[in-house]
A protein has these predicted regions:
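Short, compositionally biased P/S/T/A/G/V-rich stretches that sit at domain boundaries
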Residues: 24-74, 80
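Aromatic sugar-binding surface patches on proteins
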Residues: 111-119
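Extracellular and select intracellular beta-sandwich modules with Ser/Thr-enriched
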Residues: 143-147
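Surface-exposed, short loops/turns at beta-strand junctions within beta-sandwich domains
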Residues: 122-129
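Solvent-exposed loop/turn segments flanking beta-strands in beta-repeat/beta-sandwich domains
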Residues: 82-95
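Short beta-strand edge segments in extracellular beta-sheet folds
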Residues: 149-153
Length: 153
């Protein structure tokens, strides 16, 4: 019986940890969003193609657009239904670093995605000017995209 109790307790602990990750409750250490090598890549060429804007409303709370920050810094982004629109599907959130090619960094922030927001208490990005692209869909399949520009000193 003791073996079963230990397994049950270990399983319960794993489930609690998984639930914490799923709700964005993991906020222990600073999280590297980009490596030094990725940050050193040439920036993506400027594009005039508009991003989709039919899905959820993306509100970047911090850092402010074009801000100069010191690493680590908080990242807080809210996702809400567009008026008359469907709820955001947080599992469709995608975050990419816009370099000479797009670098998908979504998996690095997944533990910090909650029901309607992304919150990273201490995000780390190497020094430089960086552009990050966020995209998300709503339950109706409509998508919104937004670019966040930040300079890390």
């Amino acid at each position: 019986m003791r073996g079963r109790t230990r397994v049950s307790l270990a399983l319960a602990g794993a489930l609690v940890a998984a639930a914490a990750c799923a709700t964005g409750a993991v906020q222990g250490e600073a999280v590297w969003l980009m490596t030094e090598g990725e940050a050193a890549l040439a920036p993506a060429p400027a594009t005039r193609a508009p991003l989709p804007n039919d899905g959820p409303v993306i509100t970047i709370i911090t850092p402010q657009q074009g801000a100069e920050v010191t690493s680590p810094f908080p990242v807080e982004i809210q996702f809400e239904p567009r008026p008359g629109g469907a709820l955001p599907k947080m599992d469709t959130l995608k975050l990419t670093a816009l370099k000479i090619f797009e670098i998908d960094i979504t998996d690095r922030v997944k533990p910090y995605v909650g029901e309607s927001k992304l919150f990273v208490k201490e995000a780390k990005i190497p020094t430089g000017r960086h552009r990050l692209k966020l995209t998300i869909e709503d339950a109706a399949g409509k998508q919104t995209g937004q670019i966040l520009e930040v300079t890390v000193r």
